[in-house]
Curated annotation (Swiss-Prot):
SUPFAM superfamilies listed in its UniProt record: ATPase domain of HSP90 chaperone/DNA topoisomerase II/histidine kinase (SSF55874)
Family: Belongs to the anti-sigma-factor family.
Name under which the protein is recorded: Anti-sigma F factor
Catalytic reaction list: L-seryl-[protein] + ATP = O-phospho-L-seryl-[protein] + ADP + H(+); L-threonyl-[protein] + ATP = O-phospho-L-threonyl-[protein] + ADP + H(+)
Keyword annotations from UniProtKB, A to Z: ATP-binding, Kinase, Nucleotide-binding, Serine/threonine-protein kinase, Sporulation, Transferase
Protein's job: Binds to sigma F and blocks its ability to form an RNA polymerase holoenzyme (E-sigma F). Phosphorylates SpoIIAA on a serine residue. This phosphorylation may enable SpoIIAA to act as an anti-anti-sigma factor that counteracts SpoIIAB and thus releases sigma F from inhibition.
């Protein structure tokens, strides 16, 4: 069985915690380990923060889109924006790369996503936006959505 959720919200930094908690509540039906749930919450925070700060440059008129699909023991997350896009995705994936060096703890978002998820795909076009697809295979899951 498959279960899915879709969410959209204004590109405001205070909505990052809302997105993180909402996704965690949805994924909790699979009874993930605490580590798995923490990793999912962390990558949602990183991807949403990237969309708000880098994609929309803190323009609250932007909209961030999240979809979560559960299939068996696997969680598929997609975070999308219609912001300014990424010129060079491979460069952006390098640890410590940032276009905003003035920001604290910049340059680790994609590295964190790659360390916590089983698969990370990033699609981006300049002036059209970015889509981040994240896949996590849960290890100790009762998988209520079989």
């Amino acid at each position: 069985m498959r279960n899915e959720m879709h969410l959209q919200f204004s590109a405001l930094s205070q909505n990052e915690s809302f997105a993180r908690v909402t996704v965690a509540a949805f994924v909790a039906q699979l009874d993930p380990t605490l580590d798995e749930l923490t990793e999912i919450k962390t990558v949602v925070s990183e991807a949403v923060t990237n969309a708000i700060i880098h994609g929309y440059e803190n323009d609250p008129s932007g909209v961030v889109y999240i979809s979560v699909i559960i299939e068996g023991h696997t969680v598929h997350l997609t975070i999308r924006d219609h912001g300014k896009g990424i010129e060079n995705v491979e460069e952006a994936r390098q640890p410590l790369f940032t276009t905003k060096p003035e920001l604290e703890r910049s340059g680790m978002g994609f590295t964190i996503m790659e360390n916590f998820m089983d698969e990370v795909n990033i699609y981006s076009k300049v002036n059209e936006g970015t889509t981040v697809e994240l896949i996590k295979h849960l290890t100790k899951s009762k998988a209520l959505c079989n």
